[in-house]
Amino acid sequence: MNLMAKTYFTSDHEWLRVEGGIATVGITDYAQEQLGDLVFVELPETGKKLTKGDTAVVVESVKAASDVYAPVDGEITEANGTLSSDPSLVNSAATGAGWLWKMRLADESQLAGLMDEAAYKAHIA
C-alpha cells in the first residue's frame, strides 16, 4: 500500500485510495466478512462513466449477490481482471490485491463527503 495515498471510506463499505486524481476502489474487510466467500465478480468496462451511487460492480458470494456502488463521479480506467479467475482474492486481501476498479475522479471535492478510517471504524462499531 502506498502510504502517500489517502484512503477514504463510504457508509456502503467501500474504500477509495486516491493518488494523482485516480481512485482505486474496493470493498472493506467488514463488507467481505458480511458477504462470505465470493464466487463471482462482475467487473466494469474500462471507459465507463459513473455517477456517484451508480452500480459499478456486482459481487456474488455463497450467501447473496450485492451491488458495489460508485462512491464518487468518474470514469473507469482499469478493472482488476485477476478477480475474474480468482474472486476469493477480495476475501483474502480486500484492501490490497482484491481491489475492484480504478477510476479517474471527475470532482475531487466529492471526497470531502466521505469518511476517514476513524469515522468508518465508528460507523461499523
From Swiss-Prot:
Protein name: Glycine cleavage system H protein
Gene Ontology CC terms: cytosol; glycine cleavage complex
PANTHER family to which the protein is assigned, alphabetical: GLYCINE CLEAVAGE SYSTEM H PROTEIN (PTHR11715), GLYCINE CLEAVAGE SYSTEM H PROTEIN-RELATED (PTHR11715:SF3)
Subunit structure: The glycine cleavage system is composed of four proteins: P, T, L and H.
Details of cofactor binding: Binds 1 lipoyl cofactor covalently.
Lipoyl-binding domain: residues covered: 22-104
Keywords from the named record: Lipoyl
Positions bearing N6-lipoyllysine: 63
HAMAP family for this protein: GcvH (MF_00272)
Keyword NADP part of the UniProt annotation: no
Any one of the GO BP annotations: glycine decarboxylation via glycine cleavage system
Chain's role: The glycine cleavage system catalyzes the degradation of glycine. The H protein shuttles the methylamine group of glycine from the P protein to the T protein.
Cofactor (UniProt): (R)-lipoate
UniProt KW RNA-binding keyword: no
Membership in a protein family: Belongs to the GcvH family.
Species: Mesorhizobium japonicum (strain LMG 29417 / CECT 9101 / MAFF 303099)
Pfam family, one: GCV_H
